[in-house]
Regions:
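Aromatic- and carboxylate-enriched substrate-binding clefts and catalytic-loop regions
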Residues: 3-195
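Conserved, mostly hydrophobic/aromatic
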Residues: 112, 211, 268
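Catalytic cores of secreted or luminal carbohydrate-active enzymes
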Residues: 203-247
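Beta-strand-rich interaction surfaces with strong enrichment in secreted/lumenal proteins
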Residues: 245-248, 257-258, 312-314, 322-325
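Solvent-exposed beta-hairpin/edge-strand motifs
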Residues: 286-300
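Solvent-exposed beta-strand/loop surfaces of large extracellular or lumenal domains
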Residues: 296-320
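C-terminal beta-strand-rich structural cap/linker in extracellular carbohydrate-active enzymes
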Residues: 314-342
Length: 342
């Protein structure tokens, strides 16, 4: 996914006026789209409106048509800030706009990931291209504020997730921002003394891919923070197209354990609050009679004070087995269960 590709970002924070068809001179949209098709890679387009609805609707049809022509069939929209004219997101004006976007996107076979959305209404049952939405305080808040606590992340599944999928954009590996803080743009954005960081362990960041369900998932960190990282294997093995889910254990604001299945693979995600915790979990959600290779992404013993410390282990398991889930403060654990080769 690319954000900031289109002209108009120089007005951000003021009178937002974006061009949803014209890229900046140094961003060759057609060439990038052609290269993606050649490599079999699907692109995500991004449309930030800044709440300027009349401007967006004036080119909505043309923009969707153009994206489809380029082979782009996934679009993330954004509505940061209030709507122009003083309308609220949940006003009749706002709701009608969101409906118009969903229907227009469906016409061009484009899936939507809506940020700053209205509440889940069940519209995805009628318009299944409405794949996921933000609708709560997401990962991005860790970039400029006190961030999202581990307790918040053990509350979110019991509240926000009741209404449907959420695009939280989990999966950050640069937990203490040691890489990001050295970036000139980051210093200009946050200031030289900012204490922004991720408030969980790395293992919990991986577990959130399972806990916070979205059929469109995004590894949201910088590419260089993933390159050569052993834990990135989880994202390669994960299948977001889950056809079965179950909450296995949990207490609101304290801890949670979730299992999901996609085809013949199962995934488990567990997370705790600011308290270290050990849980015992039966694996009876697995297919009986099948032996799985469980790849476990866990907190290292010192993860409470070194949140990027993690362990990766493997073991053979069946539905008759039980596992211990050991989590550090603000920690978690993620497991992939892949049928063993016969």
């Amino acid at each position: 996914m690319f954000e900031g590709w289109n002209k108009g970002w120089e007005n951000w924070g003021g009178n937002q006026q974006f061009d949803y068809l014209e890229p900046y001179a140094d961003f060759d949209l057609e060439r990038i789209a052609a290269y993606a098709r050649e490599k079999g890679v699907q692109l995500w387009m991004h449309n930030e409106t800044g709440g300027n609805i009349p401007e967006y609707e004036a080119v909505l049809e043309a923009a969707m048509r153009r994206y489809a022509e380029l082979g782009v069939h996934t679009l993330k929209t954004g509505y940061a800030g209030g709507f122009k004219g003083g309308y609220l997101h949940h006003s009749q004006y706002g709701v009608q706009h969101y409906q118009r976007v969903v229907e227009t996107a469906a016409k061009y076979r484009i899936m939507l990931d809506v940020h700053e959305p209205i509440k889940e209404t069940g519209i995805r049952r009628t318009w299944p291209n409405m794949m996921t939405r933000e609708g709560a305080r997401g990962m991005e808040w860790n970039a400029w504020s006190e961030g999202n606590s581990a307790e918040y992340l053990t509350t979110l599944p019991f509240v926000r997730m009741l209404s449907g999928p959420m695009d939280y954009t989990p999966g950050i590996f640069d937990i203490d921002y040691s890489t990001a803080k050295a970036d000139k743009g980051r210093i200009e954005w946050n200031g030289p003394n900012a204490e922004c960081c991720i408030k969980t362990t790395l293992a919990r960041q991986i577990a959130n891919w399972v806990i916070i369900y979205s059929p469109l998932q995004m590894a949201a960190d910088l590419i260089e923070n993933y390159e050569g990282h052993p834990a990135f294997r989880f994202f390669r093995d994960f299948d977001a197209d889950c056809d079965w889910s179950k909450a296995l254990q949990g207490e609101i604001g304290d801890y949670i354990v979730v299992a999901r299945r996609a085809k013949d693979r199962h995934f488990l995600g567990a997370g705790t609050d600011e308290k270290a915790r050990t849980l015992v979990q039966k694996l009876d959600f697995l297919e009986p009679g099948v032996t799985y290779t469980a790849t476990i992404y866990a907190d290292a013993p010192d993860a409470g004070r070194n949140p990027e410390a993690y362990l990766i282990g493997k073991r053979a398991v069946t539905a008759r087995d039980t596992i211990r889930i050991e989590m550090a403060e603000r920690g978690g654990q993620a497991i992939t269960f892949i049928p063993a080769e016969k």
